[in-house]
From Swiss-Prot:
Keyword Zinc-finger set for record: no
Cofactor(s) the protein requires to work: Mg(2+); Mn(2+)
Residues noted as binding NAD(+) in the record, renumbered to the chain: D58, Q59, E60, Y61, D62, S107, L108, E138, R161, E198, K314, K338
Protein name (Swiss-Prot/TrEMBL): DNA ligase
Record's catalysed reaction(s): NAD(+) + (deoxyribonucleotide)n-3'-hydroxyl + 5'-phospho-(deoxyribonucleotide)m = (deoxyribonucleotide)n+m + AMP + beta-nicotinamide D-nucleotide
Any one of the GO BP annotations: DNA replication
Entries under CDD domains matching the protein: BRCT_DNA_ligase_like, LIGANc
One GO molecular-function entry: metal ion binding
UniProt keyword annotations, A-Z: DNA damage, DNA repair, DNA replication, Ligase, Magnesium, Manganese, Metal-binding, NAD, Zinc
One GO CC term on file: cytosol
Gene (name only): ligA
Pfam families: BRCT, DNA_ligase_aden, DNA_ligase_OB, HHH_2, HHH_5
Catalytic residue list: K140
Signal peptide: none
Length: 689
């Protein structure tokens, strides 16, 4: 009977005949077939999306998938969370909730130097005298860091790294990625399994995606990593499902109900239960084998399906991780060796001058298109005029290109042997190419001091509206050009005065587009203070610093009145950053902008802010020495309970937290009579003990 039903499903596609009633099959037969289909499709998904070896034709796969959809439509009670039909949600999200990483997601220290790599390996051996140590060498994948949680084998939570301590809940978006199994392939799954890795887009898929976007008149993505990050930030999982994303896992987070002894054992375990892992990795017993493996990886990395920019070298034995510990930002048991940037050669045809949001003039080279590190490049930065002089680069030269950080194309050299004598000097402009104001030099930088400069305003608006700031979807480059050029928007705050009547009269803006944009603008008012701080574009203040400032000060009023001295006491703020913040809020134009944003109803209070009446309220802590967790993670826990963390001791310091190998602060605290506590005592205070 089931075979008869399958035959009719297929014939239905060809002859448009109706399938027989499923009632005649019997419920148990239907349920059994449903389970078979789920397992079959999961098997075919793994073969196609992970192993790149399809087991059936597209038509056969589609027939099975359609049959499963039909069964579940007629019997919705059969739908399980791991069914392939449940990957794509029907309803867009209103926003991303936050996920706290119980074990922080850290980055790796890195180097381009063989000597520094060997020094790292030597430090490991010195820290573990007499121990037998081996190392793994894995591809350092240039994607977006993610965490995936499986409870009793079922995928239940996905998150971004965020600031390492708190990330975004992207569960619904990760479910759309076919290489991520919704259920682990094991009859005895761990109670709780957190795996960490990367979401990525292959260079070939990236090129195809951009080609399609170009046909549709959409803004192109800069590189595969940006395309991946932008896709995961989409609120509508249906949009994410259309993007060619994949995942690969290599790291461990929180584990309950399982143990591994080595990184090699962990990777093999992940592969066994159906999770995609790096295609190649090596286990090495000494530094020479490590360096040899790094060389082998470099030879084959362009054949891998994911972009890589180096090798991750890790201590293989997990038991040593707690002994080696962590720095403030990275584990001491792992290190990244980065390969020298890939180079390309092309002719420089022209130089244009771009005006940044702070008024800095950047010379940009226009060149014959050339393929470089996964993308076709026709423009590259020359950074500044000091760099132009140092390279002795001229219009008409054949130049060498690299991608800074594997992202931004830059001119790094000139092939002087190909000079023809017709090349032209690159002359710095005397007047701003946007507003016509006379330019002035500030060190090696050429700047436009006119804050009303249209080019600066456009860049400020685009920065303010970007995904990591106020996330105003629809406010792209083309529309911003029109709004500024027509004099409709003269300040960032003016975007909150836009109305439907104004927008529908602009090019490529219909009624629906205008309504969607206005909705996005209204929604942006609810964004957390951290996003607003980042969106303001304060020089030297990035996304993470913005989150830290919002968490510490809690309100825009407190931040805007902070002194340089107060800022310098924060563990995450340096001298240049502190001065930049104070100078920003001193400017009258910036104060006026903030007041207008306040009146328009933007959120000036952070949900990330420290508890005003927490267990550590009113107490100030200074940390010295090495703790079991990164210092930044400990500091965030103190702040979340209402406490403050400072870099320097004073008579107002409540406690000095003392870890192993403390510095000079220990003696200084004793002289000042400041109470000393260890990490365990701090943890008891954090939990109200």
């Amino acid at each position: 009977m089931i075979e008869s039903y399958l035959a009719f499903i297929f014939l239905n596609k060809v002859n448009k005949k109706k399938a027989p009633s499923l009632d005649s099959l019997g419920y148990e037969e239907i349920k059994k077939r449903h389970d078979e289909l789920v397992k079959l499709i999961r098997k075919y998904d793994y073969a196609y999306y992970v192993e790149a070896h399809p087991l059936v034709s597209d038509q056969e796969y589609d027939n099975l998938y359609h049959e499963l959809e039909t069964l579940e439509k007629l019997h919705p009670e059969l739908i399980t969370p791991d069914s392939p039909t449940q990957r794509i949600g029907e309803t867009p999200l209103s926003g991303f909730s936050q996920v706290t990483h119980e074990i922080p997601m850290l980055s790796l220290e890195n180097t381009y130097s063989k000597e520094e790599l060997f020094a790292f390996l030597e430090r490991i051996k010195r820290a573990l005298p007499g121990k037998k140590i081996s190392f793994t060498v894995e591809p350092k994948i240039d994607g977006v860091s993610i965490s995936a949680v499986y409870k009793n084998g079922l995928f239940s939570l996905g998150a971004t790294r965020g600031n390492g301590t708190v990330g975004d809940d992207i569960t619904q978006n990760l479910k759309t990625i076919r290489s991520l199994p919704l259920r682990l392939e094991t009859p005895d799954p761990p109670e709780y399994l957190e795996v960490r890795g990367e979401a990525y887009m292959s260079p070939k898929d990236f090129e195809r995606l951009n080609a399609q976007r170009e046909k549709e008149g959409k803004v192109l993505f800069a590189n595969p990593r940006n395309a991946t990050a932008g896709s995961l930030k989409q609120l509508d999982p249906r949009v994410v499902a259309e993007r060619p994303l994949a995942v690969v896992f290599y790291g461990a987070g929180k584990l309950v109900g399982m143990k591994c002894k080595t990184q090699e054992e962990w990777l093999n375990f992940l592969k066994k239960i159906g999770l995609p892992i790096p295609i190649v990795f090596w286990v090495c017993s000494n530094e020479n084998e490590v360096y040899e493996a790094i060389g082998k990886l470099n030879e084959c990395r362009n054949q891998l399906p994911y972009p890589t920019d180096g090798a991750a070298v890790k201590v293989n034995e997990w038991e040593y991780y707690s002994l080696l510990g962590y720095t403030a930002k990275a584990p001491r048991w792992a290190f990244a060796y980065k390969y020298g940037a890939e180079r390309a050669k092309t002719r420089l045809n022209n130089v244009i001058f771009q005006v940044g949001r702070s008024g800095t003039i950047t010379p940009v080279a226009e060149m014959d298109p050339v393929f470089l590190s996964g993308t076709t490049v026709s423009r590259a930065t020359l950074h500044n005029f000091d760099q132009v002089k140092r390279l002795d680069v001229k219009i008409g030269d054949v130049v060498y290109l690299e991608k800074a950080g594997e992202v931004i194309p830059e001119v790094v050299g000139v092939d002087l042997n190909q000079r023809r004598g017709t090349e032209k000097e690159i002359v710095p402009p005397e007047f701003c190419p946007s507003c016509g104001e006379k330019l002035s030099w500030e060190g090696i930088f050429l700047r436009c001091e006119n804050e009303n400069c249209p080019a600066q305003l456009k860049e400020r608006i685009l920065h303010f509206a970007q995904r990591n700031a106020m996330d105003i979807q629809g406010l792209g480059e083309s529309l911003v050009d029109q709004l500024v050029d027509k004099g409709i928007v003269k300040d960032v705050a003016d975007i909150y005065d836009l109305d439907e009547e104004t927008l529908v009269n602009l090019d490529r803006m219909g009624k629906k587009s205008a309504q969607n944009l206005l909705k996005a603008i209204e929604e942006s008012k609810k964004k957390d203070l951290s996003r607003l701080i980042f969106g303001l574009g304060i020089p030297h203040i990035g996304q993470k610093a913005s989150e830290d400032l919002a968490r510490y000060f809690g309100t825009m009023d407190k931040l805007s009145h902070a002194t340089e001295e107060e800022l310098l006491n924060l563990p995450f703020i340096g001298e240049i950053m502190a001065r930049s913040i104070v100078n920003y809020f001193r400017k009258e134009a910036n104060r006026r902008r903030l007041e207008k944003l306040r009146k328009k109803g933007l959120n000036f209070v952070s949900t990330l802010s420290q508890a005003s009446s927490g267990t550590l309220s009113g107490k100030t802590f200074v940390i010295t020495g090495t703790l079991s967790e990164p210092r930044e993670s400990i500091a965030q826990k103190i702040i979340s309970k209402g406490g403050r963390v400072s870099n320097s001791l004073s008579r107002k310091t409540s406690y000095l937290v003392v870890g192993s190998d403390p510095g000079s602060k220990l003696q200084e605290a004793k002289k000042l009579g400041i109470p000393l506590i260890n990490e365990q005592e701090l943890l008891e205070m954090l939990h109200g003990g």
